[in-house]
Amino acid sequence: METESRVAVIGIVVDQTGDTEELNKVLHQYGQYIVGRMGIPYHKRNVNIISVVIDAPGDVISALSGKLGMLRGISSKALYSNCLLYTSPSP
């Protein structure tokens, strides 16, 4: 059985009250799907902006984005690519 995988970027905005410890725990849970991540501090607005590139099934991407959005002081949105990749599960 093949699994559909998608590439997406999850944009995360962390305000000064953001729970960064919990954010990192959640990202670590999904580490097997994360291709890369980049964080940028925006001092003028007192926020941090993180972009996470992920290659995973759509339900995994949605679950991660949803969990991140429920954290205190954190907003997130997922942007999906149009390309799909079908892979066979590992034995």
Please identify what each model-predicted range represents.
Residues 35-51:
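Amphipathic, hydrophobic secondary-structure cores in small proteins
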Residues 36-38, 72-83:
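Conserved short beta-strand edge segments in small beta-sheet-based binding/regulatory domains
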Residues 17-33:
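Short amphipathic alpha-helix segments
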Residues 86-91:
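Conserved small/polar residues in nucleotide/adenosyl-binding loops
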Residues 28-31, 35, 69, 73:
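Signal for well-folded cores of large energy- and translation-related assemblies
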Residues 23-27, 63-70:
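Short amphipathic alpha-helices in soluble, non-transmembrane regions
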Residues 4-14:
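Short glycine-/aliphatic-rich beta-strand segments at the starts of folded cytosolic domains
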Residues 16-17, 54-59:
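Helix N-cap motif at beta-to-alpha junctions
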